[in-house]
From Swiss-Prot:
Main location (coarse class): cytoplasm
Keyword Cell wall biogenesis/degradation applies: yes
Keywords: ATP-binding, Cell cycle, Cell division, Cell shape, Cell wall biogenesis/degradation, Cytoplasm, Ligase, Nucleotide-binding, Peptidoglycan synthesis
Residues involved in ATP binding: G114, T115, H116, G117, K118, T119, T120
Protein's pathway: Cell wall biogenesis; peptidoglycan biosynthesis
Organism: Nitrobacter winogradskyi (strain ATCC 25391 / DSM 10237 / CIP 104748 / NCIMB 11846 / Nb-255)
Summary of the function given for this chain in its UniProt record: Cell wall formation.
Location in or out of the cell: Cytoplasm
Protein name: UDP-N-acetylmuramate--L-alanine ligase
Length: 467
């Protein structure tokens, strides 16, 4: 039995969230009656309303009246008035991943997992399958610039989804093709130990059916070790590693992007194949690796080399992934979601490759617990930044932790040898600081998962206002 077409209103609590909004949009496009609520207005709420979805701002018990099912994410607390009202009325309550799994049951599915790179890789897989006339349905964790949304309903038999591992619910997703980009010690608030994180990713791959396959990056030592422990499943490895089945080679910066080729090696026959002259309009080795994963899937599904090459060269990127928000006197301002040390280091390396000028990082640490758990890593991931401007920690609902704040982070960066670290007293002071620091050819890279994205978009105009 599948999700009945005649089911009444499906109510999403927190419908404006990036994960929830994509599922709601696809359900709406399929003809289901969708409604929801969110704590505030936002771009996703506006977009859903334009599609005819009723969205209420604020969580109130009366919002669920008449709903046949309630969809919640793990961010919704047990004392949420809508959740409590639904349970009092015996309305079925499902987690976000469970509803996503219902949609995935309708299609053959590619699911992209990993601590970093999921959203970009999901977008790349979707782009290549779209170019190959697969017309996929897509549910992503970020806004795909080519679509102007994080979700689309396709008429084809394939679905491409971002598999969020943060709460372990990605194990519920019925996956035919799994991608694992990397595995780091993240989301320990849920998993408790890194061993548990690794076990979850291993289960994710082992859940792939015998007729499916997994694409795994063996440049990452944890993933390479995991490959050696997985039995009875078809694995395609990728990376710059000479042992990879799909190998990224001859990578070179190319005018703000990358130029490379990909080599395929069949382990059974030792036959080789090459796709040369690949151009990706995004900088950084990490993005070239993400593209290699997408190419591996596209090649396996029969998409031609020429189609892959053309689609990759036209890839429009993802919002908040090395997004240029504007320029001022030859200074480029970049907005990026990077909030983990591995991501920050990769983004700054990409910035360093993209300019002959200086790289100025503006970082808004996200969550006290993350800064505390990875303090050493945070203090050593800014090596490619000439200057680091440090804002207050974005709490994301957390209680402050003594000794884990902006000023201690500034001291930590300096103690680890960084030459120029500037504390940001308030967001209103950012334009003045950048105006004093930046020169023509410099990149200003705003990093974080909080509201720093708003600063990044406002900064070019604020700089122009200063003269």
């Amino acid at each position: 039995m599948r999700l009945p077409r005649e089911i009444g209103p499906i109510h999403f609590v927190g419908i404006g969230g990036i994960g929830m909004s994509g599922i709601a949009e696809v359900l709406c496009n399929l003809g289901y009656t969708v409604q929801g609520s969110d704590a505030s207005e936002g771009a996703n709420v506006v977009r859903l309303r334009e599609k005819g979805v009723k969205v209420t701002v604020g969580h109130k018990a009366g919002n669920v009246n008449g709903a046949d099912v309630l969809v919640v994410s793990t961010a919704i607390k047990r004392d949420n008035p809508e959740l409590m009202a639904a349970r009092a009325q015996r309305i079925p309550v499902v987690r976000r991943a469970e509803m996503l799994a219902e949609l995935m049951r309708l299609k053959s599915c590619v699911a992209i997992a990993g601590t970093h790179g999921k959203t970009t890789t999901t977008s790349m897989v979707a782009t290549l399958l779209d170019a190959g006339d697969f017309d996929p349905t897509v549910i992503n964790g970020g806004i795909i610039n080519a679509y102007g949304t994080n979700a689309r309903l396709g008429a084809g038999e394939w679905m491409v989804v971002e598999a969020d591992e943060s709460d372990g619910t990605f194990l519920k997703l019925p996956t035919d093709v799994a991608i694992v980009t990397n595995v780091d010690a993240e989301h320990l608030d849920h998993f408790k130990t890194f061993d548990a994180v690794q076990d979850a990713f291993r289960s994710f791959v082992e859940n792939v059916p015998f007729y499916g396959f997994a694409v795994m990056c063996i440049d990452h030592p944890v993933v390479q070790a995991m490959v050696g422990r997985i039995e009875d499943r078809r694995i395609i490895t990728y990376g710059q590693n000479p042992q990879a089945d799909v190998r990224l080679v001859d990578l070179a910066p190319n005018g703000g992007g990358s130029h490379f080729k990909v080599m395929f090696r069949n382990r059974k026959t030792d036959a080789a194949h090459e796709i040369s002259d690949l151009v990706l309009p995004m900088p950084g080795p990490h993005n070239a690796l993400n593209a290699t994963a997408a190419i591996a899937v596209a090649h396996e599904l029969g998409i031609t080399d020429a189609t892959i090459r053309k689609a990759l060269a036209a890839f429009g990127g993802v919002k908040r992934r090395f997004t240029r928000t504007g320029e001022w006197n030859g200074v480029t301002v970049i907005d990026d979601y990077g909030h983990h040390p591995v991501e920050i280091a990769a983004v700054l390396k990409a910035a360093r490759e993209s300019t002959d000028g200086r790289v100025i990082a503006v970082v808004q640490p996200h969550r006290y617990t993350r800064l505390q758990a990875l303090f050493e890593e945070f203090c050593t991931c800014f090596n490619d930044a000439d200057t680091v401007v440090v804002a207050d920690v974005y709490p994301a609902g957390e209680t402050p932790i003594v000794g884990i704040d902006r000023d201690h982070f500034v001291l930590g960066l300096r103690a680890h040898g960084h030459r120029e670290v500037v504390p940001l007293p308030e967001s209103a002071a950012l334009a003045g600081i950048i105006a004093d620091l930046a020169k023509q050819g410099d990149y200003v890279v705003c990093l974080g998962a909080g509201n720093i994205t708003q600063w990044a978009y406002a900064l070019p105009g604020e700089l122009k206002a200063l003269g």
